[in-house]
Amino acid sequence: MKYLIAGTGGVGGSIAGFLSLAGKDVTCIARGAHLQSIQTNGLKLKSDLKGEHTLRIPATTAEEFNGKADVIFVCVKGYSVDSIVELIKRAAHKDTVVIPILNVYGTGPRIQKLVPEVTVLDGCIYIVGFVSGTGEITQMGKIFRLVYGSHHGTVVKPGLLEAIQQDLQEAGIKVDLSPDINRDTFIKWSFISAMAVTGAYYDVPMGEVQKPGKIRDTFIGLSTESAALGKKLGVDFPEDPVSYNLKVIDKLDPESTASMQKDLARGHDSEIQGLLFDMIAAAEEQGIDIPTYRMVAEKFKESNH
C-alpha cells in the first residue's frame, strides 16, 4: 500500500520514519528548509524505540505531489487543515482512506465536509515527537500508540483498516482499531488540552505536573472540567477520565513539553485555539462550568487576538 504523510513534523515524521524502516512505500509532504534537507540529506530519525537512522524517503510540497495514495495520514496542525484539501482531492482514488492525526477534536468530520467524495476516518496519537533540527525528527520515550477508526455511517473497503493496522504494527507502532473513534478522539483532546494548557500556563515540562501541588491540581481541574463536557456530549468513558489523564501524564518523560507549548515559546502559530478556546466555547455551549479553563485563558487572551 502507498502511504502519504501530509505534514512531516514530530508526528508525521515519526510515522513516516517507522513505516520506511519497515520497508513500506511512504512519501512525505513538507515545505521550506525542512523539505530541502529531507530531499538532499534524507530524513534523520532519532528514536528511543528505533535508534538513529537517516532515511531516504521521497518528499515533496503539497502542490508538487501528483501521485495517488491508498492511505493519507493528515499530520498538519489544526490551523493548517484547509491548506491540504487540494492535496487530498488529487491524491485520493475511490478506495483511499484519509486518517487525520490531530490534537483537535472533530477533525475527521471537518475534513469530510471539505472533501465529501473521499473516505475520511478519524484518529489520534500518543507520542512525544518533535522537529529537533532541519530535516530531523526526535521520538522520545516508549509510547507510540496510534488509534483510528471510522465514524458511524462511513463505508470503508472491507479489510482495509486491518491491513493498515498490520503495516503499522510491523513498523513497530502500537495500534488500536477503535470501535468508537468519537470517544477516543475526545479522550485524546481532553488529555492534550490539559497537558498543553498546564505546561504553557506555568511554562514547565511535564515533570512538574507529575509532582503533587498547585501545577498538578490545575491539570486535575482542567481534566475534571473537560470530563464533565464529555459526559454532557454523550461520550462513554471506559474509565474515569481524570485518573486516565493522570496515568498518561505520569508515564511521560519528565523533560517533555507539548508542541503547543514549544510553539508559543518560539512565538510560532500554535494550536491554542483548538486546545484552549474551542474547549471553552464547547463547554459554554453545553452550560458546563469551567473555572480552571477560564482562569488559564486570561493569560492567553492577548496571544490569540
Where are these predicted regions, by residue range?
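Active-site-proximal catalytic alpha-helix in oxidoreductases
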Residues: 182-210, 214-227, 253
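NAD(P)-dependent Rossmann-like dehydrogenase/reductase catalytic/cofactor-binding core
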Residues: 220-305
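NAD(P)+-binding Rossmann beta1-loop-alpha1 motif at the extreme N-terminus of oxidoreductases
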Residues: 1-51
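Flavin-binding catalytic cores
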Residues: 159, 163-174, 215-238
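Rossmann-fold dinucleotide-binding core
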Residues: 67, 103-184, 188
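Rossmann-like NAD(P)(H) cofactor-binding subdomain of soluble oxidoreductases
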Residues: 52-136
